[in-house]
Amino acid sequence: MPKLGMQSIRRRQLIDATLEAINEVGMHDATIAQIARRAGVSTGIISHYFRDKNGLLEATMRDITSQLRDAVLNRLHALPQGSAEQRLQAIVGGNFDETQVSSAAMKAWLAFWASSMHQPMLYRLQQVSSRRLLSNLVSEFRRELPREQAQEAGYGLAALIDGLWLRAALSGKPLDKPLAHSLTRHFITQHLPTD
C-alpha cells in the first residue's frame, strides 16, 4: 500500500530531476532512465505518475508556468493600491524571478518553446502563459492609457521582457537583472503619462 503524501513528493522529485537532466543534456537527450536515476526511483515510477516522457515534460512545464504565475501574483498582491508603474514593475520582477532565470529553468523554457511548435499540449501551455503575460501588462497600462495605446504598450513590454530573457538564455550567462529592470523601467515610464 502506498504511503500517504508520497505522490506529491515523488512528483516533485521527478520534476526536479527532469529539470536537472534538461539543464545538463537537453530535453531530447534526457532519457527516462537518466531522470529516474537522478530521482533515485525506478523507471516504472515515472510511468505510474506521468505515463511517459511527454507526460513528465508536460508536468515539468506546468510546474514552471505555475511558478511564474505565483511569482507575478505574489508581487501584485503585495501592491493592492500600487500605481500602474509599480504593478508593471512587479510583473517584470515576476518574469525575472530566480525560478524563471536559473540555468535549468531557462533551458527548460527554450526546449519547451521549441517543442510547443510540434506538440499540441505544450502549444496550449505556451499560449496560456503568453496570453497571461500580455493580459496582465495591458490591464495595468489600461489604468493610465486608452485601450489601443495600452495594447501596444503591453505588447511592446512583453516583447522586451521576452527579448531580454531570450538574450540571457542564449548567452549562457545569468540575466543581468539590474540592466533588465532599468530597460523595462525606462520603457514603462516612456509609455505612461507624466503627472
From Swiss-Prot:
Gene3D superfamilies: Tetracycline Repressor, domain 2 (1.10.357.10). Residues 8-68 form the HTH tetR-type domain. Keywords: DNA-binding, Repressor, Transcription, Transcription regulation. Residues 31-50 bind DNA. The keyword Cell inner membrane does not apply. Repressor involved in the biosynthesis of the osmoprotectant glycine betaine. It represses transcription of the choline transporter BetT and the genes of BetAB involved in the synthesis of glycine betaine. This is HTH-type transcriptional regulator BetI. It comes from Escherichia coli (strain SE11). The gene is betI.
